[in-house]
Amino acid sequence: MKPARIVFPGFWFGKSSIKKAEELARLGVGGFCLYGATAKKAQDFVKRMQDVSPYGQLLFCADITDTLQEVITDAPALPANGKIGQHDFPQDVAYRKGYLTARMALAVGINWVLAPVVDLGYNTPAFGDVPLQVTQLAGDFIAGLSNGGALNCVKYFPGVSGVLKTLAQMEDAEFVPYKHMFRRADAIMPSDMIFPNIDNDNQAMLSDKVIKGLLKKRLNYKGCVVSFPLFKGHLKYEAASAVKMLHCNVENILAPRDAEGVIDAVEREVDKGFLVDEIIHAVSNHEMFLSKVAAGPEPLPVKEAFALAEKDFKKK
C-alpha cells in the first residue's frame, strides 16, 4: 500500500521545481494539479511525470471554476457558465462546453476536470440561481465531460450560497443539484468555508458533520470525496489538516503547499494502524478512474482539439 498515491501535488509552471515534481512522482503520488501552463508545457510535463512514476499512468487535474483557460493559458475561450442560460438552447451549449473542455483537456494530458461548480448565484462560475436550472445545465456539462473522456468533480459542497442558511432551507435549494448528480459525479469537493448552522467549528472540508454526517449519511452519497485545494484553504497546520480530512472520508488530497510533509504525516498515521482501509478504498477508486479514462475516446492532437472548440462557439 502506498499512501502517497492519494496525494496530488500542485505544479505551477514557471514557479515550481521540475526536479521536485519528479521526486514526488517517483514517491508514487497519484497525479498532479496543473496551474498556469501552455498546452505544450502541459504535454511535456505529463509525459515526464508518467515516465518516472512507478505506476506509468497518473491522473492530471485541471482545478477550474469555469473554463480551461484558467489553467491552460492558450486554450480557446468557451462561454462563461453564468451566460449559458442566455442562449437559445442552453442545455446544448452546456453539453458542448463540457464536451469541448474534455477534448481540449485530454489533448494536453489532463484527464480530470475539477468542475462543475454547482453553487447557486448570479455571477460566473454559477450556472444560475434557480436550483433546477443549475441542475440541468451542470448535468449537461457533466454529460459532455464524460462523453469527451474526462473525469468530473462537482463542487463546492454543501453550497456556498447556503452559508447562512439552515439545513431545511438548503434542502430545497443548494442540495438539489447534488442529489440529482450523485450518480454521475466522479467526485465531490467540499467548500473551504464554515457553515455555522451545520458545524460552527470547522471548515466544510475539515468537518466530520458536513462530510460524514451530511454528505455521506443524510444525502447518501457513496462516491469519492476530494479535498479543496489545500494551498487555497487558509490552513495553519497543513499536514495535520490533511490527516483530519482523511478521517472525515476525504479520499484524495489536492495541491498541498508541502506535498512531502503531507505524505509523511499520512504514512505516520498508517504506521499507527489508522486509515489503512480508507487508503485501500481510495486507491481502488483511483484504479477505477484510470480504467474509466482508458476506456474513453482517444485524445485529439492539440491543434485539432483547440480548432474544434474555436469553430464550435464562433456562432454561439
Language-model segments: what does each one mean?
Residues 1-10, 155, 159, 212-234:
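Mobile, glycine- and charge-enriched loop segments
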Residues 1-28, 217, 236-316:
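Preference for extracellular/luminal or secreted protein segments
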Residues 3-5, 29-30, 54-59, 109-111, ...:
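Short, well-ordered coil/turn segments that N-cap beta-strands
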Residues 19-24, 101, 108-110, 142-145, ...:
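Structured alpha-helical segments in the cores of large, soluble enzyme domains
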Residues 22-137, 156, 161-169, 191-204, ...:
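Enzymes and membrane/adaptor proteins characterized by extended Gly/Ser/Thr/Asp/Glu-rich
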Residues 46-54, 106, 138-147, 207-220:
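Surface-exposed amphipathic alpha-helices with a cationic face
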Residues 137-156, 164, 168-187:
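Phosphate/pyrophosphate-binding betaalpha-module
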Residues 180-198, 223:
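Oxyanion-binding "anion nests"
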